[in-house]
Amino acid sequence: MDWVLTSAPALAQEIPGIDELIVDLVDVDPGDAEWVRPGEARAAPASPDYDAVIEVAATARDLQRAAEMIEREFKTGSAVLSMYRTRPMPARIDRARRAGARSPGVKYIVLCRFHADMPQSAVQRSWAHHVSLALRVHVGADIYIRHWVEETLSPGAPPVEGVTELHFPTFEDMCSRWFIDDDGRRQIIQDIGHFLASGTRLYTSEHVLKAPDPA
């Protein structure tokens, strides 16, 4: 998967209008820290669903150019490529992302599929209502961002309707401070059950290749 990290900088070089470029390598084994809802299967760190996630923030025109370049440069051999256009909804950002190095800690990403019998407006309302609980319970996370999927760009890509990212500044924070306590964990499991049908869980290392200049 390292070839993704070495190849991705060409995106920013070819498309200077890209505001932010991040590569998340799915290379973290959560071990006993992994959490699942009752009845869910655990992830398989040795054979994850994806090897990497590439995040691009840019104008609509530059996003289209980036998608075309990713399709051309990264979809080789047996590689499976799934691209989505999302609308980010930051809830907590307590640390600035700095370009040029691996970010500390672990970035946990969930590709969300919501209950099929729920109208989109109801899902959005329930997910937005969940934010205050998540901020109170996930005390170890210094970044919490939700993404609403507005368009699937890859024909035949698996259905993904939302993306959640929680970033823990250290592995220990993920292990011991994911939830404020057992009751908080129970509340999270109960609340997401109202709108989340299933999710693909990815434990990643974040590499920021380009970031907006600090204010």
Q: Which sequence ranges carry the predicted segments?
A:
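Macromolecular interaction modules
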Residues: M1-A215
